């Protein structure tokens, strides 16, 4: 699994856990709906740290909590 897939999967998981839609996340995080859609559809190759931080704010979690999953613990460095 690459970076963008792992991030998209984590966002979907958090939306499901909190019972919010991607549109609702756009409202609470101040991240444009088009940006969230791009991340979830795998069109965004590398979501920026500021965007992920805003999404975390919308979820009311820290960056550490966002990345604190087994998927990210086993991440290998991607060199391209």
Where are these regions (language model features)?
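The alpha-helix within a helix-turn-helix
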Residues: 15, 26, 56
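Short alpha-helical DNA-recognition segment
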Residues: 19-38
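A short, Lys/Arg-rich alpha-helix, primarily the initiator
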Residues: 1-23
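Residues in the recognition helix of alpha-helical DNA-binding motifs
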Residues: 14, 28, 39, 69
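The DNA-recognition helices of helix-turn-helix-type DNA-binding domains
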Residues: 32, 43, 70-74
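Intrinsically disordered, low-complexity basic tails/linkers immediately adjacent to helix-turn-helix/homeobox/MYB/SANT
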Residues: 57-65
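Short, basic-rich loop-to-helix N-cap that marks the start of a DNA-contacting helix
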Residues: 43-57
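Short, charged recognition helix plus adjacent turn
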Residues: 38, 67-80
